[in-house]
């Protein structure tokens, strides 16, 4: 089935196309419309013309974490099938601020923030994508030239009633929480990106489904063949509760040091581990099922967690780094102090323990420091600190918070 206005003929669905479709569907939440996408794949195979696969990311923060790589991994799989990947940096839409999943207006970024964040975005994404097979675009290329006249014409193509079909907008409207007019523009501008790029498929998280469908509708209005849409699940953070987010502190950045990345991955629950295998591992589903069977048969879950952590560390660093990270983790687990801990010099002795931990960079706040003390997670030279009112005298010592955070502190008066 095809929605192309020129009604192109159907192409045969071969075993090769079925395989490509199976690769595409691995781990996805939804592929709309599957029959249309199968025809796009078949046409591409018959004509030798690659599909145009679009992924837009707003540079709202300078770092990419593992949650972002769920959709990047899918892009790489499609790239390996021979299709053109368009890595779209939303430098224009970042000025608006994506309201998806928000219960309040998202503050737009400044041009300076956007440019600073965008500099490192693709360099990190290229750790997943094939740099040579990736087309990099900025949506300011076609959005800025629209001007007021073009923006008004674009806005006329969608109604407020349709916008209020979005769950987050509906909840805010019913709850009396303000919705700014500029927030309605975001889905329209993202949809217009698909028109400008003539996309065959657009990828996004499940929270992006409405925006992706707007792109499909706008393409129809502009006389283009409609894109299919593919949504990927949102990866849970290290806590296994909320989606991975830097602001929530439950993330693993792909630029983190190997030891830190490895340690964080080893901290996830045994249940969450299998979710990470499905969404982050490049192992086949059959192999993952076999490993899971071994776990259910009594093998220690730690063995599989080590496999996962090593695979991910090796992907973003090297196999040698992954091996060293495992050695470091085992050393710490036995109570040892890592060799590469930071050295910090502080003044003000005697210094309150909460302030010492914060100033040493081991915790973000004194309240977090006190919480760790309550839980027995703070040690000085191997001795557990239990007194939240402790004043630390001048000297040199190793301070530890939790299993992974260390600092060699020199405290002076």
From Swiss-Prot:
It catalyses: tRNA(Tyr) + L-tyrosine + ATP = L-tyrosyl-tRNA(Tyr) + AMP + diphosphate + H(+). CDD domains: S4, TyrRS_core. The keyword Kinase does not apply. It comes from the Bacteria. GO terms for biological process: tyrosyl-tRNA aminoacylation. ATP binds at residue 246. SUPFAM superfamilies: Alpha-L RNA-binding motif, Nucleotidylyl transferase. It is found in: Cytoplasm. Pfam families: S4 (PF01479), tRNA-synt_1b (PF00579). GO terms for cellular component: cytosol. Residues 351-411 form the S4 RNA-binding domain. Its EC number is 6.1.1.1. Catalyzes the attachment of tyrosine to tRNA(Tyr) in a two-step reaction: tyrosine is first activated by ATP to form Tyr-AMP and then transferred to the acceptor end of tRNA(Tyr). Belongs to the class-I aminoacyl-tRNA synthetase family. TyrS type 2 subfamily. This is Tyrosine--tRNA ligase. It comes from Burkholderia thailandensis (strain ATCC 700388 / DSM 13276 / CCUG 48851 / CIP 106301 / E264).
């Amino acid at each position: 089935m095809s929605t192309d206005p020129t009604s192109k003929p159907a192409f045969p669905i071969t075993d090769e196309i079925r395989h490509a479709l199976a690769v595409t569907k691995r781990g996805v939440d939804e592929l709309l419309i599957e029959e249309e996408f199968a025809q796009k794949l078949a046409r591409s195979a018959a004509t030798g013309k690659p599909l145009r696969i679009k992924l837009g990311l707003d540079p709202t923060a300078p770092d990419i974490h593992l949650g972002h790589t769920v959709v990047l991994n899918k892009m790489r799989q499609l790239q390996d099938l021979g299709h053109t990947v368009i890595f779209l940096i939303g430098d224009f839409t970042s000025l608006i601020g994506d309201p998806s999943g928000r219960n309040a207006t998202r503050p737009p970024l400044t041009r300076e923030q956007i440019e600073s964040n965008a500099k490192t975005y693709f360099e990190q994404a290229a750790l997943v994508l094939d740099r040579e097979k990736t087309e990099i675009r900025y949506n300011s290329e076609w959005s800025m030239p629209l001007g007021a006249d073009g923006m008004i014409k674009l806005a006329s193509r969608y109604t407020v009633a349709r916008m209020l079909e979005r769950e987050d907008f509906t909840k805010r409207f019913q709850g009396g929480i303000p919705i700014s007019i500029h927030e309605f523009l975001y889905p329209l501008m993202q949809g217009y990106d698909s028109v400008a790029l003539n996309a065959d498929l657009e990828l996004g998280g499940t929270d992006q489904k409405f925006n992706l469908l707007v792109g499909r509708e706008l393409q129809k209005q502009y006389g283009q063949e409609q894109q299919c849409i593919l949504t990927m699940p949102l990866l849970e953070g290290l806590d296994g509760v909320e989606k991975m987010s830097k602001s929530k502190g439950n993330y693993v950045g792909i630029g983190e040091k190997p030891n830190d990345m490895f340690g964080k991955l080893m901290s996830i629950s045994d249940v969450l581990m299998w979710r990470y295998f499905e969404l982050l591992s490049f192992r086949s589903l059959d192999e993952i099922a076999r490993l899971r069977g071994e776990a259910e048969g009594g093998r220690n879950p730690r063995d599989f967690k080590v496999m996962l952590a090593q695979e991910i560390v090796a992907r973003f660093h090297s196999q040698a780094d992954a091996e060293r990270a495992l050695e470091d983790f085992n050393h710490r687990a036995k109570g040892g102090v890592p060799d590469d801990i930071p050295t910090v010099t502080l003044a003000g002795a005697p210094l309150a323990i909460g302030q010492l931990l914060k100033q040493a960079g081991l915790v973000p706040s004194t309240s977090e420091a006190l919480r760790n003390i309550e839980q027995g997670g703070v040690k000085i030279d191997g001795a557990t600190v239990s007194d939240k009112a402790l004043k630390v005298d001048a000297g040199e010592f190793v301070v530890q918070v939790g299993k992974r955070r260390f600092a060699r502190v020199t405290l002076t008066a």
